[in-house]
Design a protein with these regions (language model features):
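C-lobe/activation-segment region of protein kinase-like
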Residues: 190-252
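Juxta-kinase regulatory segment immediately upstream of eukaryotic protein kinase catalytic domains
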Residues: 1-48
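Conserved ATP-binding subdomain of kinase catalytic cores across diverse folds
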Residues: 33-141, 165, 169
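Hydrophobic residue at the +6 position relative to the catalytic HRD Asp in the kinase catalytic loop
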Residues: 177-184
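AlphaC helix of the protein kinase catalytic domain
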Residues: 142-151
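Conserved alphaE helix
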Residues: 155-163
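Conserved catalytic-core element of eukaryotic-like protein kinases
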Residues: 173
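Generic detector of well-ordered alpha-helical packing
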Residues: 71, 136, 177, 194-196
Length: 252
């Protein structure tokens, strides 16, 4: 089912009309196809809100569990033509299954990522749609939100750099490393959204990830007071990034 690495016995695949679901039975043992529909949670009074972006992320509170439900949507010009549909090749290459399995592997390795709960694709002819459910992290907010609220300490910037380096040392190339996909809590830094991410040998792409993050930081702070993001802050992040984790290979 994984194609590249072993999944634990708690991971199951179930067929649904026109597609399949992949899920962790320890987190979603009674998974239903309806769980991927926001209106289902709304009808039960368990939809807590939503975060808008390229694709809405819905916040769900199910019993004692807090989850994020996301429907895959295109960005840019392609969104005008296909919105939420992607070219079908095979099950393994569907965006929800690929992201779920990579996130599963990262979480199992102890990296600061949300635990994957379930993923689904539905195939129709030569295209498919997809959805994913992940754990909602107990965070203060995204890096963007925190910067809008006030300046961050140099210790926080160093921690952000260290976090990114942990992923890069293990060859995790984040396809969209930006200020929205870095989450902060009182004690931890997390990365989210591993759609289209790849495992690669560390190389020039690592610098490309950092350049992308820098552009994002400049974009989200350009209208804010200048002390919200300074050169000293960026150098603090780079100082943290230079502190290698020493781990260079993900466990199988």
């Amino acid at each position: 089912m994984s194609g590249r690495f072993a999944l634990g016995p708690e991971v199951k695949r179930s067929a649904v009309a026109g597609g399949a679901m992949l899920y962790d039975t320890s987190r979603a043992g009674n998974l239903s196809n309806e769980w991927f529909e926001p209106r289902y949670w709304q009808s039960r009074g368990e939809l807590q809100g939503a975060a808008r972006g390229r694709g809405a992320a819905y916040f769900v509170k199910h019993d004692t569990k807090n989850w994020v439900l996301r429907h895959y949507r295109r960005g840019g010009l392609m969104a005008q033509l296909f919105a939420d549909r992607y070219r079908w090749r095979n099950e393994e290459s569907t965006r929800p299954f690929a992201e779920w399995q990579l996130t599963y592997r990262l979480h199992r390795a102890g990296l600061p990522v949300p635990a994957p709960v379930a993923a689904r694709y539905r195939n129709r002819g030569s295209s498919y749609t997809g959805d994913i459910i992940t754990e909602r992290l107990p965070t203060v907010g995204s890096l963007t939100e925190c910067l809008r609220a006030g300046a961050l300490s140099i210790v926080t910037w160093i921690s952000i750099g260290r976090c990114i380096r942990r992923f890069h040392d293990l060859g995790v190339c984040h396809a969209d490393l930006n200020a929205h996909n870095v989450l902060l809590s009182e004690e931890n830094v997390y990365l989210i959204d591993f759609d289209r991410c790849q495992l690669r040998r560390p190389g020039m792409w690592c610098d490309g990830n950092l350049v992308r993050l820098r552009r994002s930081l400049e974009k989200v702070t350009w209208a804010l007071p200048p002390e919200r993001f300074t050169e000293s802050d960026w150098h603090g992040l780079l100082d943290g990034y230079r502190q290698s984790s020493g781990k260079t290979e993900l466990p199988p």
